């Protein structure tokens, strides 16, 4: 997943350059898997297929991933990502653009 993420991050920075002088801010939100959002999205099938090949369930894999692969021992909640998105869209973050917000609970370090 590193290459697709890097492409999205680079694209967001290019958008910030192109749109900044029009007063448009661009902030890229990088999150890890969001367990409470998975059942609501197309990713449920992707996770189910992957974990079935590993001989486990999506829920068990997410729990293990959170404990072993994140610094905080958990994964981000949808509410946390939404709260941050609302903040960076607000005037309180009006000076911010061309930035990457790492909301991975420490699974990816910048």
Question: What is each PLM-predicted segment?
Answer:
Residues 1-7:
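The catalytic Tyr-X3-Lys active-site helix of short-chain dehydrogenase/reductase
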Residues 7-15, 19, 29, 88:
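Hydrophobic alpha-helix immediately C-terminal to the catalytic Tyr-X-X-X-Lys motif of short-chain
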Residues 20, 25, 96-98:
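Short, small/polar-rich loop/turn modules that mediate ligand/substrate recognition or access, typified
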Residues 21, 34-69, 80:
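A glycine/serine/threonine-rich, flexible loop-to-helix segment
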Residues 25-35, 89, 102-104:
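Conserved SDR Rossmann-fold cofactor-binding beta-strand/turn motif
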Residues 74, 86, 93-110:
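Short C-terminal tail/terminal secondary-structure segment
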Residues 81-84, 88:
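Non-catalytic, hydrophobic alpha-helical segments
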């Amino acid at each position: 997943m590193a290459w697709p993420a890097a492409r999205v991050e680079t694209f967001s920075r290019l958008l910030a350059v192109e749109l900044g002088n029009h007063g448009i801010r661009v902030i890229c939100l990088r999150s890890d898997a969001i367990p409470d959002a998975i059942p609501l999205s197309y990713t449920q099938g992707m996770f189910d297929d992957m974990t079935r090949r590993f001989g486990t369930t999506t829920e068990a894999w997410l729990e293990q991933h959170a404990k072993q692969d994140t610094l905080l021992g958990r994964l981000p909640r949808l509410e946390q990502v939404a709260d941050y998105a609302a903040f960076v869209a607000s005037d309180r973050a009006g000076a911010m653009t061309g930035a990457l917000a790492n909301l991975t609970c420490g699974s990816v370090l910048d």
